[in-house]
Structures are given as structure tokens and as C-alpha cells.
Amino acid sequence: MFKKVVIVLAVILAALAAFVATRPADYRVVRSRTVAAPPDVVHAYVSDFHKWPEWSPWEKLDPAMKRDFSGAPSGTGAEYHWSGNSDVGEGQMTITDSRPPQSVTIRLEFLKPFAATSTTQFDFAPSGAGTNVTWTMNGHNNFMAKAFSAFMDMDKMIGADFEKGLAGLDAATVAARRQ
């Protein structure tokens, strides 16, 4: 009897491992929104990590989050490290490329609760009196991340936060222009 149970468990584990192995290795999340501000204003809000608390959806999850800024004040070379509650974890972002007013590319490294690295890009295109902002995140799933993605949809999970962030970016840039 014990031998049969072990064989059944081994078959189940092998089937689960085979299923996880067939999951996509890469993920991509993309959201866009037209923001009621010109590209140079929107670019300035994204390329300066000091302005992220005004619009980033994750900043609101832990008002007591510790933030450290280093490197350039904004643009290429700017760095931002955060450490907070279980909702935000710990990680850092580095702007690896900033092309005013067209784009900002960021290396995003999560340290806690799990280690992961992604590339995030913001693209800005004039659209009437505003700017079409496209926020993209690309990353690679290791075996454990593939297992996680079997039960959680990255596009739905991160996409909802991107939508909140783009709405916050719109509100922050509009408010800044009124001052």
C-alpha cells in the first residue's frame, strides 16, 4: 500500500513539474493611457523618482515605507531603493536610459519577498493636447516563477496597478500644471 501511495505521489509531482515547465518563460505587461499634459512634463514625472510618491500606486500601500535615493537626481543613473511592509517588499529601481521627452527605461529589482528582475519602459508620444503614455514591463520567469504564474496572471495582477499608476500620473501632472 505504501509503495502505491509513493508511486501515485511521484506521478502527480512529475505531472505538476511537466505542467510548470511548459509555462511561458517570459512575461510582458503593457498598459496605455492618454495623459492631459505635454510629453516633457510627463517625462519629468517619470524620470525623477522623488516625484513617484505623487502618482505610483505602490507608494500608497505603505506610507511608512523607507525610501533611499542615490545616483543622479533624475534621468539616467538615478536610483531608488525601498523597503516596506509585506505589500511592497523591498527592491530597487535604476534608470538605465532616459530620452527626454520620448522614453524612460528602468531596471527593476525585487529583493523581498522574492528575488526577481524586470525591465520597465515608459514611452511618451504627443496626442492632441496631451501625451499617450505606454507603460511596459518585461521579465523572465524561473521555474518557481513559472509555478506561481500557473495560479496568478501577471497581466491582470500588474496590469491593474499600471492602470492605477497611469491615472495617478495623469492627476499629478494636471495638478502640477495648475500651480
Residue ranges, per PLM feature:
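Extracytoplasmic/secreted envelope proteins and their assembly/folding machinery
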Residues: P39, H43-W52, G77, Q92, ...
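Residue-level recognition of beta-strand microenvironments
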Residues: P38, S98-P101
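Extracytoplasmic/periplasmic/luminal assembly and interaction segments
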Residues: F49-R99, K146-F148
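Generic structural detector for well-ordered beta-strands
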Residues: S32-A36, H81-S83, T94, T105-R107, ...
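Short, highly charged C-terminal tails/helix-capping segments
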Residues: R67-D68, D170-Q179
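Beta-strand/loop substructures that line and gate deep hydrophobic ligand-binding cavities in soluble
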Residues: T96-D97, R107-E163, L169-A171
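Hydrophobic ligand-binding cavity/cleft-lining segments
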Residues: K4-A72
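Short, surface-exposed coil-to-beta transition loops
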Residues: R28-V30, V88-M93, A115-Q121
